[in-house]
Amino acid sequence: MGASLNEIKTKIASTKKTSQITGAMQMVSAAKLQKAESHAKAFQIYAEKVRKITTDLVSSDKEPAKNPMMIKREVKKTGYLVITSDRGLVGGYNSNILKSVMNTIRKRHANESEYTILALGGTGADFFKARNVKVSYVLRGLSDQPTFEEVRAIVTEAVTEYQAEEFDELYVCYNHHVNSLVSDARMEKMLPISFEESGQQKPSLETFELEPDRETILNQLLPQYAESMIYGSIVDAKTAEHAAGMTAMRTATDNAHSVINDLTIQYNRARQASITQEITEIVAGASAL
């Protein structure tokens, strides 16, 4: 019984240390989440302004814009930019989006020639590699608050491949941050660019004279616009990642406390049984005398 008591005490001590670690990780993730949410809100304001200006420019002429970035073409190949984390300990953050992507690929495509994948995040890259799914581009090791410079390579690669007609449409697959408890797996079509959901207000640029002409401006602006929208998805996904990490560590801490309580009850019962047995043996010995 003594050895059993010692084993339980060791488990309790070990679990307490684990709960301290997960509790600290929860606090770190909470701090990262707060910064990420501020970053995401600031970018959203910028993105809305850019979208309005771009929409006004596209709509500033009676003739529809003829830029290749906006023209729908026959879809022979689809590009998927899949955003995951580099590390684990984020609950179902990675599995949700990866499962969604794989289900979509199975439904839409007959073979590998019909799609290509760009992976942002080590978890996604390793996931596809383990399943012999070809990945055309991989970017790992993003910081907790990624700047555009960090992701410029993969974002530019996605836009460049589309412009070169290596694929005919691009979907960005990521977890959208709703709140600290909820994220939503999304698969957003980024290319070709569409402004169909824009409001019906009269464009504010139609009274302006554009220099150089509208098409020349759009040739420069639309690729940058697409890159900024993709970057916005990355910022959003990173925020969801921090929220998932915080939730996972909070759950782990709560589970550790529950285990400690159960072990403490088990320890007290075992100790009580040990004491009862000792008393019984003493009484039996005294009676024998």
From Swiss-Prot:
Alphabetized PROSITE patterns for the sequence: ATPASE_GAMMA
List, in alphabetical order, the GO biological process terms annotated in this UniProt record: proton motive force-driven plasma membrane ATP synthesis
Entry superkingdom: Bacteria
May I have one GO cellular component term?
Answer: proton-transporting ATP synthase complex
Primary localization:
membrane
Q: How does it sit in the membrane?
A: Peripheral membrane protein
Q: Which NCBIfam families match?
A: ATPsyn_F1gamma, PRK05621.2-1
Sum up the protein's function in the record's words. Answer: Produces ATP from ADP in the presence of a proton gradient across the membrane. The gamma chain is believed to be important in regulating ATPase activity and the flow of protons through the CF(0) complex.
Q: What is this protein called?
A: ATP synthase gamma chain
Protein source organism: Lactococcus lactis subsp. lactis (strain IL1403)
